[in-house]
């Protein structure tokens, strides 16, 4: 249907806006789409709407950049023209460029989020913001050294069998309470 995609990584202020999106989503959504369709994610875009302090705007840029996109796009020129965020971002982008020249591909705990699944709203992103390096994927990460399974992972009927094979092969798994509750009747 489409040749490529571009990812909106705006998270705004998670406390005062209606979206309540954790900031780590700026990173995890990029890695999710890159893992879904490698090489076809053109980049990440973010805006300055509902970012009441400069740090909120800059954090969207940092987290998007750390996902190693092909490019960053600053959305909505009219809202950025003559705005205090732009000089601050320019200053930080120079530093990010120097840092990212030495960074490799994003790695971390593989969080299995199958397509079209509902679960614990963004729990992986909250875990990311407290320091767990979470990288999201729509495919069961059987080769990953460590995985995170949430209620969203439980929407796949054979996920418990996949988990059993993974752990039997010496993989390390972290599961959430939501995953356990959703799979109790499947032998977890």
Cite the ranges covered by each PLM segment.
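Hydrophobic targeting/anchoring helices
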Residues: 1-133
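Helical hinge/lid and interdomain linker segments adjacent to catalytic or ligand-binding clefts
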Residues: 114-186
């Amino acid at each position: 249907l489409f040749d490529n995609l571009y990812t909106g990584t705006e998270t705004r202020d998670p406390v005062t806006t209606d979206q309540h999106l954790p900031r780590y989503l700026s990173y995890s959504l990029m890695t999710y789409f890159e893992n879904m369709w490698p090489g076809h994610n053109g980049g990440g875009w973010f805006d300055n709407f509902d970012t009441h302090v400069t740090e909120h705007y800059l954090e969207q840029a940092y987290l998007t950049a750390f996902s190693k996109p092909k490019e960053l796009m600053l959305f909505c020129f009219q809202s950025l023209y003559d705005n205090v965020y732009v000089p601050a971002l320019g200053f930080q982008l120079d530093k990010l460029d120097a840092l990212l020249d030495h960074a490799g591909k994003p790695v971390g705990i593989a969080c299995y989020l199958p397509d079209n699944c509902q679960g614990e709203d963004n729990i992986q992103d909250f875990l990311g913001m407290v320091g767990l390096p979470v990288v999201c994927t729509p495919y069961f990460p059987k080769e990953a050294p460590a995985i995170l399974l949430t209620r969203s992972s439980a929407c796949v009927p054979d996920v418990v069998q996949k988990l059993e094979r993974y752990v039997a092969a010496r993989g390390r798994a972290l599961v959430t309470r939501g995953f356990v509750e959703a799979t109790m009747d499947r032998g977890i």
